[in-house]
Amino acid sequence: MKPFNELVQHFSDAQGRAALLGMLRGIEREALRIDESGYLALDGHPLELGSALTHSRITTDYSEALLEFITPVNHQVESLLQGLTETHAYSVRHLHGQRLWPVSMPCYVKDEANIPIARYGTSNTGKMKTLYRKGLTYRYGALMQIISGVHFNFSVSQELWQSLYELSDKSLSFDDFISESYFGLIRNYRRLVWVLPYLFGASPALCNSFIKGQKTDLRFEKSGRGTLYLPYATSLRMSDLGYTNKEQADLNISYNSLPEYLAGIRAAIKMPSANFANIGVKVDGEYRQLNANVLQIENEFYSPIRAKRVTKSGEKPSEALARAGVEYIEVRALDVNPFSPIGIEASQVRFLDLFLLYCLLTPSPKSDAAEEARLSANLKSVVLEGRKPGLELHTATGTLSLQTWLLELFDNLSSLAVLLDGETNAYQAALAHWRDAVVDPQKTLSGQVLQQLVTKGQDHGQWVMSLAQQYHQYFIDYPLSSEAASDYDAEAQSSLAKQVELEAAQSAVSLDDYLTDYFGAPA
């Protein structure tokens, strides 16, 4: 592959710029429902929002209380965020006074045992989804599962792939070239993933109730009545306190090629876990988990980025990738942005565009175990002390200061921003905005959060509740068109009908037989 700056130059004509701008994006935003006192909602998913099993835009994640809003795929940043805003506005109007918790880390949970696991009806598909979540509860506890985040889906245009393929040696088929190039993007992303918690990490603090009873070596400082924080942390969500899986630490799944990745995932699905076997699979006639393997299903594999392809009915993610290769990637390292009603803002999306294009267009050597260890250490350093003055990160040849590394990255991104902007200024403005946070760590999202809590002496829970109320009013006042509202009404009804159809179609097959068929062997 040509050097990055040469590639940017190669795409500098109108046709090349159009190929770069043909990006497709989607956003998935998770948010807990809370009551007016700030406590986790314990009721079921609101019926007016439709079926969480079959609705394309409004579903649930781990819990009945953990809403997930999904945008359709979109070419335009503004319409992408408008669609996400409309989904929020419609949903809030059907929450009967409940609010959305606008940060990643949960707070007011009276009893972890009462966190309601998501339910999806009586079809075997729905029962399997609930049972998978029951397994997560037994394995890791419920509290960890209600940490919320934002996922960003990204793909580039066929025109860009054609141009890049023409520049390659064409030793691969076109489809294989696309998959291998996406894995090149993934490897470079993993080398630089620490950039995202540095800029966008927004969970340097949490309520002390979250770690009640947990052992931790982290030296928290206290603020307000019940706030714990680390002075230089960026994203406790991405730390060992958040969603990590010690059972997965030894999987060593390779991102060096699609075949190696698929082989690793398939091996993990079949790898037995002594710890999880102790839970039991079916005890006294009742399932506790889908199986006792390291991963119950592929979705349990934790990674800050995933290679994806839209699946056909009944198809596993790895089967879709094996069938037709990588279609898009899913970025999973984003905290909820508490300063945006929808958890993410346009300048973040544009930075992600630049960042991911850079990861794609930069040469990406294969990784080895020594590099993987460095990458893991760098990410851990940044999530726990990313704003620490003079922080050094590991490179192949020694160490480099985080700030120096970031400034070099921003310099590289600037030529791409100029090209994408053409006659406009949106990408350059986004880059300038976040460059300020490189120079002044207080301007990162985590820096801004700690200014609210520590400098102003606010309690974490109270501050988040005030934001929840503010955003609740924002969505109530949002000018949702009658056409948009009718469209959501119609999908709510059609999704419920689809669930009923699925339940009827699967009624003759027992859950045992369904799981045996799904896994190809007794669960």
From Swiss-Prot:
Record carries keyword Transport: no
Keyword Transmembrane helix carried by entry: no
Pfam family, one: Glu_cys_ligase
Catalysed transformations (reactions): L-cysteine + L-glutamate + ATP = gamma-L-glutamyl-L-cysteine + ADP + phosphate + H(+)
EC number(s) per entry: 6.3.2.2
GO MF term (any one): metal ion binding
Cellular component aspect of the GO annotation: cytosol
Pathway: Sulfur metabolism; glutathione biosynthesis; glutathione from L-cysteine and L-glutamate: step 1/2
Gene Ontology process terms (BP): glutathione biosynthetic process
Keywords noted in UniProt: ATP-binding, Glutathione biosynthesis, Ligase, Nucleotide-binding
Entry similarity comment: Belongs to the glutamate--cysteine ligase type 1 family. Type 1 subfamily.
PANTHER family: GLUTAMATE--CYSTEINE LIGASE
Protein known as: Glutamate--cysteine ligase
